């Protein structure tokens, strides 16, 4: 059966699991919302949802500087207690996220931060291209929906493929870390600087350099 975006979003809100995980759960359970929740819980992907409502006001600001000094990242990751903030696994998570940001260059933490005008501009571009194919409007809208989701996956940290394991998203990595540590964890914000960014210069693939330096 066909799984709609509304079904996926509803399941995502209920569980906190990633979009692709929600879609797979609904597909595997024939679109049954409750069974999909059970599916995600059995997979350990909905464990984070029980903790998502708890306040995370402790944490750490992590940093990563590329070996050549060409890229720098600061990221704030919050947890519930100072005890966990000093935990080695939490510290390793913060470091891994900072390294991912350096390599993948996201622009936002989550899709909700992307302004409506930015999304609408992308939709108009996709719509214009899709109409050139001569396909019906209902098909065009489905094409646009898929392209917008890909757009989010390119620019939103939580929806990007995790650079150290491309089989999972950063959101899935976060959910796994929450489940293993037992506290709510939230990636609040980050800044990423690239040497000479915005200036005319010779093209260099800094992201590839970061990945290579990290052995990814």
From Swiss-Prot:
InterPro entries linked to this entry: EF-Ts_dimer_sf, Transl_elong_EFTs/EF1B, Transl_elong_EFTs/EF1B_dimer, Transl_elong_Ts_CS, UBA-like_sf
Main location: cytoplasm
Disulfide bonds: none
Record keywords: Cytoplasm, Elongation factor, Protein biosynthesis
UniProt entry tagged with the keyword Magnesium: no
Gene Ontology terms: cellular component: cytoplasm
Subcellular location: Cytoplasm
Region span, Involved in Mg(2+) ion dislocation from EF-Tu: 81-84
CDD domains: UBA_EF-Ts
Matches recorded under Pfam families: EF_TS
SUPFAM superfamilies, per database record: Elongation factor Ts (EF-Ts), dimerisation domain, UBA-like
Keyword Protein biosynthesis attributed: yes
GO terms, molecular function: translation elongation factor activity
Domain of life according to the entry: Bacteria
Role according to the record: Associates with the EF-Tu.GDP complex and induces the exchange of GDP to GTP. It remains bound to the aminoacyl-tRNA.EF-Tu.GTP complex up to the GTP hydrolysis stage on the ribosome.
HAMAP family reported in the protein's UniProt record: EF_Ts
Database matches in NCBIfam families: tsf
PANTHER family: ELONGATION FACTOR TS (PTHR11741), ELONGATION FACTOR TS, MITOCHONDRIAL (PTHR11741:SF0)
Family: Belongs to the EF-Ts family.
Protein name: Elongation factor Ts
Species, as recorded: Geobacter metallireducens (strain ATCC 53774 / DSM 7210 / GS-15)
Name of the coding gene: tsf
């Amino acid at each position: 059966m066909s799984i709609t975006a509304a079904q996926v979003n509803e399941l995502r809100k209920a569980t906190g699991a990633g979009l692709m995980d929600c879609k797979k759960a609904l597909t595997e359970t024939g679109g049954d919302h409750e069974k999909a929740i059970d599916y995600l819980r059995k997979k350990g992907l909905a464990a984070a949802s029980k903790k998502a409502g708890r306040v995370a006001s402790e944490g750490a600001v992590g940093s990563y500087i590329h070996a050549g000094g060409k890229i720098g990242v600061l990221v704030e990751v919050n947890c519930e207690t100072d005890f966990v903030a000093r935990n080695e696994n939490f510290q390793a998570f913060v470091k891994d996220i900072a390294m991912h940001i350096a390599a993948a260059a996201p622009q936002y933490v989550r899709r909700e931060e992307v302004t409506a005008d930015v999304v609408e501009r992308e939709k108009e571009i996709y719509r214009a291209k899709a109409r050139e194919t001569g396909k019906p409007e209902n098909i065009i809208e489905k094409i646009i929906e898929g392209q917008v989701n890909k757009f989010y996956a390119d620019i939103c940290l939580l929806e990007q493929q995790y650079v150290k394991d491309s089989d999972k998203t950063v959101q899935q990595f976060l959910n796994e870390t929450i489940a293993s540590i037992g506290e709510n964890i939230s990636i609040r914000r980050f800044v990423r600087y690239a040497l000479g960014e915005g200036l005319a210069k010779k093209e260099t693939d800094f992201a590839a350099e970061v990945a290579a330096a990290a052995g990814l």
